[in-house]
UniProtKB/Swiss-Prot annotation:
Residues 1-28 form a transit peptide. Belongs to the complex I NDUFS6 subunit family. The modification N6-acetyllysine is found at residue 98. Keywords: Acetylation, Electron transport, Membrane, Mitochondrion, Mitochondrion inner membrane, Respiratory chain, Transit peptide, Transport. PANTHER family: NADH DEHYDROGENASE [UBIQUINONE] IRON-SULFUR PROTEIN 6, MITOCHONDRIAL, NADH-UBIQUINONE OXIDOREDUCTASE 13 KD-A SUBUNIT. Mammalian complex I is composed of 45 different subunits. This is a component of the iron-sulfur (IP) fragment of the enzyme. Accessory subunit of the mitochondrial membrane respiratory chain NADH dehydrogenase (Complex I), that is believed not to be involved in catalysis. Complex I functions in the transfer of electrons from NADH to the respiratory chain. The immediate electron acceptor for the enzyme is believed to be ubiquinone. Its main location: mitochondrion. It is found in: Mitochondrion inner membrane. It comes from Macaca fascicularis. This is NADH dehydrogenase [ubiquinone] iron-sulfur protein 6, mitochondrial. The gene is NDUFS6. GO terms for biological process: mitochondrial electron transport, NADH to ubiquinone. Coiled coil: none annotated.
Length: 124
């Protein structure tokens, strides 16, 4: 019983609070390690005796609380009419190189490899 509870806590981002939330709800806030240090989007956290903690002796570790992967996951799947869609990430200087995504595969949704946006062909 205790092992399954620990496993469930490790899988969920927010620990015990995740059980009471609906599946689509987002956990606001930053994950914190047992030492009280904020965990970055890459999972970077240092032990108490790690020499790399010297960077944060007189300063607080600044972590952006809006992880990009979480923000992209909140975007709804876009319904399109064509079977091939071109994604350029919004275009202009803020976009990425144009990629063409084939939507008639078995997965039924196509994901852009650059920005993570998802597309689905609208059935006619």
């Amino acid at each position: 019983m205790a092992a399954s509870a620990t496993f469930y806590r490790l899988l969920s981002r927010c620990g015990k609070a995740a059980r009471s939330r609906p599946l689509g709800a987002r956990c606001f806030g930053v994950r914190v390690s047992p030492t009280g240090e904020k965990i970055t989007h890459t999972g970077q956290v240092y032990d108490d005796k790690d020499y790399r903690r010297i960077r944060f002796v007189d300063r607080q570790k600044e972590v952006n609380e809006n992880f990009a992967i979480d923000l992209i996951a909140e975007q709804p799947v876009s319904e399109v009419q064509t079977r091939v869609i071109a994604c350029d990430g919004g275009g202009g200087a803020l976009g990425h190189p144009k990629v063409y995504i084939n939507l008639d595969k078995e997965t039924k949704t196509g994901t852009c490899g650059y920005c993570g946006l998802q597309f689905r062909q609208h059935p006619h």
